[in-house]
């Protein structure tokens, strides 16, 4: 790679040496081809004579030609451009420019800094619009200082709406307890920061999510007593037990008419039926009672069937054992009476 690069550099140097021409002694100014072409033109003598005349007039009449280039403009230059069509320089002036004051004014700088540091200016003048100490409206500004609210006492806070200092609205820099007060007494502050822990609490304690609290704090907690928010229910022992529920608790589909007017004891007496000479209470209309009674009857039937099967198996075993004993006795008797 290095050998190829050196070869290319050598070729480039040879090419440049072939196309270049070393000039040891430069030619004179009169031998320039451009001047010779200009001299061959027909109007070359006229242009040369005019330039010579102008140079002669400037050298003879005006001994200081540099003063002719100095110009004084009435307005400051705002921009400088170039007109390529006319080959000229275009100057743009600022007609209504503010008169510059290059003197250092410490009061003006202090006012400017104070305005820059303040926040939330509503309709106040900017720092550039403040009257100068040498201007015509300086003394008028002093008279209107109360209106403009510049350089007030630190006790007079910003954004006051014509109220007395103790009842100011949205004043900055006051005590933390008096922030965003709506003309109220400090004891009746609304939306105060740093208020006590029991503010806007609905009868709750600080330890709201604590388990096993006292019965007095029964607002939406787990483990409340059984009689909380119950609608006409009986004692906890009779509510949703494995049996008959209370008849007057949200029963749907009850019969109307004569049956609805009967009492509970009369309904039970009417439902009693006789079977096999024994009085057995009929199944009540409650679906839970029906399901429980059906399960109980099925269980009793299964037990009876199992007991019957056991008794049959025992009887069969006894019969087998007795038959075997009889066979053995007969065989022994036959052997005894053989000749």
From Swiss-Prot:
Belongs to the FARP (FMRFamide related peptide) family. GO terms for cellular component: extracellular space. Residues 319-329 have a biased composition (Polar residues). Pfam families: FARP. The modification Asparagine amide is found at residue 242. This is FMRFamide-related peptides. InterPro entries: FMRFamid-related_peptide-like, FMRFamide-related_np. Residues 23-110, 126-151, 205-212, 256-339 form a propeptide. Keywords: Amidation, Cleavage on pair of basic residues, Neuropeptide, Repeat, Secreted, Signal. Residues 300-311 have a biased composition (Low complexity). In insects, FMRFamide and related peptides have modulatory actions at skeletal neuromuscular junctions, and peptides that are immunologically related to FMRFamide are released into the circulation from neurohemal organs. Residues 1-22 form the signal peptide. It comes from the Eukaryota. One of its GO terms (molecular function) is receptor ligand activity. The gene is FMRFa. GO terms for biological process: adult locomotory behavior; behavioral defense response; larval locomotory behavior; negative regulation of heart rate; neuropeptide signaling pathway; positive regulation of cytosolic calcium ion concentration; positive regulation of neuromuscular synaptic transmission; regulation of striated muscle contraction. The modification Phenylalanine amide is found at residues 122, 161, 172, 182, 193, 202, 222, 231, 252. This precursor includes 10 peptides that have FMRF or related sequences at their C-termini. The keyword Repeat applies. The keyword rRNA processing does not apply. Residues 38-67, 271-339 are annotated as: Disordered. PANTHER family: FMRFAMIDE-RELATED PEPTIDES.
